[in-house]
Amino acid sequence: MPKIKTVRGAAKRFKKTASGGFKRKQSHLRHILTKKTTKRKRHLRHKSMVAKADNVLVVACLPYA
């Protein structure tokens, strides 16, 4: 049985937590930042969790996580 390949882009974007979930970075913080308020940018800096509905997709991309 061959090894399952890890999706490298997903490996760089998601980290598994001890409880089995995945943490991720918020989007919309790379460019076009002048029109966004300081409060909005500050809230986007915090990490977030992957939704339960999307957990299955992330697990498929990261078979050894």
Swiss-Prot record:
Pfam families, A to Z: Ribosomal_L35p
* Ribonucleoprotein in keyword set: yes
GO CC, one annotated term: cytosolic large ribosomal subunit
Recorded hits in PROSITE patterns, A to Z, give: RIBOSOMAL_L35 (PS00936)
Example GO biological process: translation
Q: Where is this region: Disordered?
A: 1-26
Give this protein's Gene Ontology molecular function annotations: structural constituent of ribosome
Point to the regions of Basic residues compositional bias. 10-26
Q: Which UniProt keywords apply?
A: Ribonucleoprotein, Ribosomal protein
The UniProt entry, under InterPro entries, shows: Ribosomal_bL35, Ribosomal_bL35-like, Ribosomal_bL35_CS, Ribosomal_bL35_sf
Entry similarity comment: Belongs to the bacterial ribosomal protein bL35 family.
Put simply, this protein is called Large ribosomal subunit protein bL35
